[in-house]
From Swiss-Prot:
Function of the protein: Interconversion of 3- and 2-phosphoglycerate with 2,3-bisphosphoglycerate as the primer of the reaction. Can also catalyze the reaction of EC 5.4.2.4 (synthase), but with a reduced activity.
Taxonomic lineage of the native organism: Eukaryota, Metazoa, Chordata, Craniata, Vertebrata
Residues recorded with modification Phosphoserine: S14, S118, S135
Gene name of the encoded protein: PGAM2
Record InterPro entries: His_Pase_superF_clade-1 (IPR013078), His_PPase_superfam (IPR029033), PG/BPGM_mutase_AS (IPR001345), Phosphogly_mut1 (IPR005952)
Protein name as it appears in the record: Phosphoglycerate mutase 2
Length: 253
């Protein structure tokens, strides 16, 4: 029997998604398409008459702005919002800023898929000479992190390892207390939550593609186990095309 509902949404397309670049912790803006996706997400949530009590997002503007757009479009901008680096996208290390298709052509599609989708193999680390090192590693928003917490690269396993404690300590207790939760985050941090909820294998989570800007709804029991498969708020064709587009990102052109 379902007792709780959780809604999650991956941010709308960013300017770097549009350019097919590894984004990670770089603070890219929403593209025009991404802003429209966020508005459609807001409309889908409004049409479903969903209300929330508390919201969670990352410290990256593409997720924050997606959340703002949803809250604005559903007239819930007054809701409390918790921002945390633990819901950030996976840190793509030395690949940050590179075009995915060009990287696939140079290193091979299999290598890019390993870097993007393997569970425990991280990409090359971001060193101090990297053009985006200062704008990420020396950013004021991360000044409060403890020694060893700020990554230079992450595998999916690493991403889940820093996202799940926040889920367990902060989000899950709110849901169990009856709060209606909305999470606006990123493909890989959300993948970690999905893996945890569904008990998915490492291999299965590698193949899961979450579309941008389409709300994901879970019905959960008292133990926060899904009572039904995840469902998307949107028509089937839109959802299918979006998931195919995500899967095609690491292929050479």
């Amino acid at each position: 029997m379902s007792t709780h509902r959780l809604v999650m949404v991956r941010h709308g397309e960013s300017t770097w998604n549009q350019e097919n670049r590894f984004c990670g912790w770089f603070d890219a803006e929403l593209s025009e398409k991404g802003a429209e996706e966020a508005k459609k997400a807001a409309q889908a949530i409004k049409d479903a008459k969903m209300e929330f009590d508390i919201c969670y997002t990352s410290v990256l503007k593409r997720a924050i702005r997606t959340l703002w757009t949803i809250l604005d479009g559903t007239d819930q901008m007054w809701l409390p919002v918790v921002r945390t680096w633990r819901l950030n996208e996976r840190h793509y290390g030395g690949l940050t800023g590179l075009n995915k298709a060009e990287t696939a052509a140079k290193h091979g599609e299999e290598q890019v898929k390993i870097w993007r989708r393997s569970f425990d193999i991280p990409p090359p680390p971001m060193d101090e000479k990297h053009p985006y090192y200062k704008s990420i590693s020396k950013e004021r928003r991360y000044a409060g992190l403890k020694a060893g917490e700020l990554p230079t690269c992450e595998s999916l396993k690493d991403t889940i390892a820093r996202a799940l404690p926040f889920w367990n300590d902060e989000i899950a207790p709110q849901i169990k207390a009856g709060k209606r939760v909305l999470i606006a985050a990123h493909g890989n941090s959300l993948r970690g939550i999905v893996k945890h909820l569904e008990g998915m294998s490492d291999q299965a989570i590698m193949e899961l593609n979450l579309p941008t800007g389409i709300p994901i709804v879970y019905e959960l029991d008292q133990a926060l186990k899904p009572t039904k498969p995840m469902r998307f708020l949107g028509d089937e064709e839109t959802v299918r095309k979006a998931m195919e587009a995500v899967a095609a990102q690491g292929k050479a052109k």
